[in-house]
Amino acid sequence: MTKEELLNSLREKGFSGKIVDAFSKVNREDFTPKNVRSMAYEDTALPIGHGQTISQPYTIAVMLSLMDLGKGKKVLEIGSGCGYVLALLSEIVGKNGKVYGVELVKELTIKSKED
């Protein structure tokens, strides 16, 4: 699946423009290990190391749609993993919003800061 196909799938499933727009601006492949990068836009969870996964895009879109998100909001994500959802949240809340993440796996925290 390509990025455009994933975006079309999210639109067809009725997700809001702000959610689809965030997915369009954040490249999922930037948050995936090289060995699974070719599958970055498949609608499936992918391993990111240390027994953790980057969540399925559909699952993330559902989660984002259930939150009261908008420009200028503050958000805390527990279990930030590779930082992909943090990047999506940052796009949605904009430059006047604040996004914070907490991750217990030190190696993932270091990797997400690099991305």
Where are these regions (language model features)?
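N-terminal auxiliary segments of SAM/dcSAM-dependent transferases
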Residues: M1-N35
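Conserved nucleotide-cofactor-binding alpha/beta core module
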Residues: D68-D115
